[in-house]
């Protein structure tokens, strides 16, 4: 008699030896209909193998100006369980506890949902874990552990936002990603709009144009603050890139879609155009221009984030399969052949209209080959949009950053090693 290979559902111990059994065997045994000889001496306790309940972990945050540090935190949190549920704090809660957010809730939701390690998202999460909300997490969302980084999260009254979770024994800690924070990124932009640099010759609209299009930056008066520096403190490692990568290439007959750009201050507009691009094929390859190219095309103040920072932000997006770190400005025939590109795409919303030019068009080769397509951008957001928000409300952000810079300085002075990656 031939027994077909099937899913193992139980185990039995006979004569000191353990046997795994399938559904058909178990069914026949329970009915007493096993073939002659197979049932002899099989009087044993059955242990039905039940599917293990997945470990569900919860992490919340503002996720304002979402960057690769946020993504790395979510990656680490996901590694502590089987399913990651993320709470995104409401605009009202952020204003009450930290000051005005740069990106509204719907944009922050788009960003968090696009992170490849996120399984579920809760909108309008509270800034602090209350008794009621913690009970809701445990009962309704079946959360096993609440996760946060090793940097302190303190409420306006000085108390720990995660005190209740710690007291309940359901709290786990991850390592904060070094070298980046939303405060740091906003600070890089505020470098050009410090109060002392605003004069009759540097109106708000003038500053917006300078920052967005790369004119000479206003000079600081002696003693002016330069805390918000464009210099990144991020130290890239090959291990981090591997952690963010999918680790697999396209199949032999895959339709490969290519899209390129700076992807500076990675935002919801980027996410949505990448989603649209990915829908056109089997594998999405993203070319990320190097810092020199971005500066030459966008102006001296760009990019805000360096090449490695921008690459990690793009790699964390669930719609992206692979990136070219330091892609050429012009899409050449060699690039198309090397990566077996089927279609080159570009969104209608962009920092420049070079893709519409007849001369010096970086996409002239794919256009001539008939493999270039312009996609309607779902959102009218660019990096300049984010910068304009900062400039328009720079006084509020300077005040917010002053508080955060002080707390971050204290964190770095008092921090200790936390295991993890």
UniProtKB/Swiss-Prot annotation:
Tissue/organ expression: Expressed in root tip, lateral root primordia, leaves, shoot apex, stem vascular bundles, pollen and embryos.
GO terms (BP aspect): phosphatidylethanolamine biosynthetic process
EC number(s) on file: 2.7.7.14
Location of this chain's protein in the cell: Mitochondrion outer membrane
Phenotype of gene-disrupted mutants: Embryonic lethality when homozygous.
UniProt cross-references to InterPro entries, sorted A to Z: CCT, Cyt_trans-like, Ect1/PCYT2, Rossmann-like_a/b/a_fold
Region (Disordered): 203-227, 402-421
GO annotation, cellular component aspect: Golgi apparatus; mitochondrial outer membrane; mitochondrion
Catalytic activity, reaction form: phosphoethanolamine + CTP + H(+) = CDP-ethanolamine + diphosphate
Any Pfam family hit: CTP_transf_like
Mode of membrane association: Single-pass membrane protein
EC class: transferase
Biased composition (Basic and acidic residues): 403-413
UniProt main location, coarse: mitochondrion
Residues engaged in binding CTP: 262-263, 270-273, 298, 346-349, 377-381
Modified residues (Phosphoserine): 416
An example Gene Ontology molecular-function term: ethanolamine-phosphate cytidylyltransferase activity
Pathway the protein acts in: Phospholipid metabolism; phosphatidylethanolamine biosynthesis; phosphatidylethanolamine from ethanolamine: step 2/3
Alphabetically ordered keywords of this record: Lipid biosynthesis, Lipid metabolism, Membrane, Mitochondrion, Mitochondrion outer membrane, Nucleotidyltransferase, Phospholipid biosynthesis, Phospholipid metabolism, Phosphoprotein, Transferase, Transmembrane, Transmembrane helix
Sequence ranges of Polar residues compositional bias: 204-215
Regions crossing the membrane: 8-28
SUPFAM superfamilies per record: Nucleotidylyl transferase
Family recorded in the similarity comment: Belongs to the cytidylyltransferase family.
Protein role: Plays an important role in the biosynthesis of the phospholipid phosphatidylethanolamine. Catalyzes the formation of CDP-ethanolamine. Essential for early embryonic development.
NCBIfam families associated with the record: cyt_tran_rel
Name of the featured protein: Ethanolamine-phosphate cytidylyltransferase
Lineage: Eukaryota, Viridiplantae, Streptophyta, Embryophyta, Tracheophyta
